[in-house]
Design a protein with these regions (language model features):
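Beta-rich carbohydrate-recognition and catalytic domains
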Residues: 1-50, 59-113, 126-176
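Electrostatic interaction modules used in gene-expression and signaling proteins
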Residues: 122-124
Length: 176
C-alpha cells in the first residue's frame, strides 16, 4: 500500500494491489480497516501486459495526483510509467502515459534480476520529479523528469472492456 499524503474528502486513501493484480484505491476513516478497494479503470499497454503495480505514494499537483507505476512486459522487462488521478476523486484516472517513462537501457540489463528498473517513490523538486530507481536488483540510478513533459506525454485512458473488470469487496473477487 502507498498512502496519499493527505486526507481527501475527510478520508484516508491508499493505492493498493489488493487482489495481487490490479491497481486500486482504497479508503478508510481510521487507517485500520480498509474495506473497499476500487480498481483503477485503465487499459493495459504492451509494456505492462504481464503485471502492473504502483511505485510509491502519489505526488499532488494542481492537475491531479501523479502516480508512478511499474509494468512488466515481454521478457519480464520491468518499466516505469505514470497515471494522473483526479484530485477530489482519486479512483478516477484522468491521464496515463502510453509509453514507459523509464526502461532498462542495454548497459542496465544485467544483474541479479535482469531487465528491471523499479522505484518505490519520487520527490518533487519544483517543476521536476526526481526518481531514484533500482537497476536489475544490483545497482541504483537517479532520473529527473520535467513534470510538464510527463503530463504532456499523457492521454485520457480507455476503460477496459467490462468482461475484464473485477471488483473486490472485503477481500473477495467478484467478476462482472
Amino acid at each position: 500500500m502507498a498512502l496519499f499524503p493527505r486526507r481527501i474528502g475527510g478520508r484516508y486513501h491508499a493505492l493498493s494491489r489488493h487482489d495481487g493484480a490490479t491497481n486500486a484505491v482504497a479508503s478508510t476513516d481510521d487507517l485500520t480497516i480498509w474495506r473497499d478497494a476500487t480498481p483503477l479503470e485503465v487499459d493495459v499497454a504492451g509494456w505492462e501486459v504481464i503485471h502492473v503495480g504502483n511505485c510509491g505514494p502519489p505526488v499532488e499537483l494542481a492537475e491531479g495526483w501523479l502516480v508512478l507505476t511499474h509494468g512488466v512486459g515481454p521478457f519480464r522487462t520491468y518499466s516505469i510509467g505514470a497515471l494522473l488521478l483526479d484530485l477530489d476523486e482519486p479512483t478516477i484516472v484522468i491521464g496515463r502515459t502510453r509509453q514507459p517513462l523509464l526502461t532498462p537501457q542495454p548497459d542496465e540489463q544485467d544483474g541479479y534480476v535482469p531487465n528491471v528498473v523499479y522505484t518505490c517513490g519520487s520527490l518533487r523538486l519544483g517543476d521536476a520529479l526526481l526518481v531514484p530507481f533500482g537497476i536489475a536488483d544490483a545497482n541504483i540510478g537517479f532520473a529527473t523528469f520535467s513534470i510538464a513533459e510527463i503530463l504532456a506525454a499523457m492521454d485520457a485512458p480507455r476503460a477496459r472492456p467490462a468482461r475484464e473488470r473485477a471488483v473486490t469487496r472485503a477481500g473477495a473477487r467478484i467478476d462482472d
